Amino acid sequence: LDYHYMDPVLLKASIIHDIFEDVKCVSPDEIISLDQDGKAVYDLVMEVTRRKDESKDEYLRRVLESGSQLAKILKCADRISNLTDLHTDTFDKGFIKKYIDETKKWVLPMAEEVNPNMHYELKDLIRRRESGLHFHRTIWPLTRTD
């Protein structure tokens, strides 16, 4: 919604995009039979779902190189949401660094392709998360000098 996308398939898929990774007892038929967009929603969700035989890099490469426009938009929006919640007080710094590197390598090019505003926001989030890593590494913990 932040980027004014009103495509019903994209919006529905954005709500359930992690369902097959997070919920083991959901069947494709449950998604497909929900409404007239069910098949298209299912197809989009599967397009942004990592396959069991894929490494994370293989998955992100697949979306970047052969994903549909909607899949790339959905992946970028998901990564923006995840980066927004990624802070050193709740996540390990090593995980944050790896996530940022992954975003630069795979998701930034997607955003550049599909939406300049998403690209700008991702670059800004990366900059802020990197500066947070640097800040915590060089300033904290504070030590008393008395």
PLM segments and residue spans:
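Active-site helical microenvironments for divalent-metal-assisted chemistry
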Residues: 1-146
